[in-house]
Amino acid sequence: MRAFLFILFFFPTLGFSQDHQNIISGNILGSSSAIGLSYERIVSDNLSLELGIGLIGIGAGATVYPWKIQTSSLCFYTGFKVSSFVLVDVGGGTVAYVPFGASFFSPANWMIGLDVGPANGKLVSSSFGGATSETTRFYIYGNFRLGFRF
């Protein structure tokens, strides 16, 4: 975790060509679990790291843009994202997925993105009686986000 935080906050200060290296976005699904906010740091022209917090969980991820991130263009990406969530009186779980999507970065520093991809989710259910069950399944997961670059 320390290495991730070091890369997220200090590595980008070495001078990459991006003028606006930070993104705050509102998300549905994705690294912020159900609904939440995420902070994304662009660490190079092709890589960004993300931390998210939502109503029921937290998450993190890395996004790789095969082609350079450019303003006023559709930028395709993939990566790896993980989120963990807790539902009071029900249980919790984790979701790991590989997104395939696209983001549009406007000249006014707004961005919008959408992705879908294969996911592996684990849910641990519990009840007041002490009984627990664990379910792991493979499914499709995604993310819709609207954010601001600064």
Where are these regions (language model features)?
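Residue-level signature of outer-membrane beta-barrel architecture
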Residues: R41, I53, V64-P66, A102-F104, ...
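Sec-dependent N-terminal signal peptides
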Residues: A3-L14
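Outer-membrane beta-barrel "beta-signal"
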Residues: A62, T136-F150
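Transmembrane beta-strand segments that form the barrel wall of outer-membrane beta-barrel proteins
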Residues: H20-I56, S73-V86, I112-A119
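Outer-membrane beta-barrel channels and translocator barrels
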Residues: S44-N46, W67-T71, F105-N109
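Mid-chain, structured segments of secreted extracytoplasmic proteins
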Residues: A60-A96
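Flexible, solvent-exposed loop segments that connect beta-strands
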Residues: D19-Q21, L47, S84-G92, N120-F138, ...
